[in-house]
């Protein structure tokens, strides 16, 4: 995988790397301290960096803001279905959501619930415990279908019945 980070010049001095490498206190610094700090972390195959322009072009050509909006809409719609089925209050307002949501589940054992989702329904999603509660987190990307969300909802309903 690859990612890129854009930071305005005037803010670059305030952004520090989470992991430091050879550029941190380089004996031969480059023209940009920001690049020295962030660009190179150890031995790396540089071919991933070369894919970034094509990825940005792909996002532009496929109207990614609209794709993202539709994904978020699906997250909100299905979260409402989860909340209605579980008869729980919404953990947060809809406008806090992006393309991901966490649903509190009335189960005590997150590991077993996750294992049952995978082994019985072939569904892989994060199920985790936080502050003595169990949560299921799902995210929607362009390649996800409504059928997959319906399958997840049905599986959760069956496991909780």
Feature roles, as predicted:
Residues 49-52, 79, 110, 114, ...:
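A general structural signal for well-ordered alpha-helical segments in protein cores
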Residues 1-25:
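Active-site PLP attachment segment
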Residues 115-161:
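PLP-dependent enzyme catalytic core of the Aspartate aminotransferase-like
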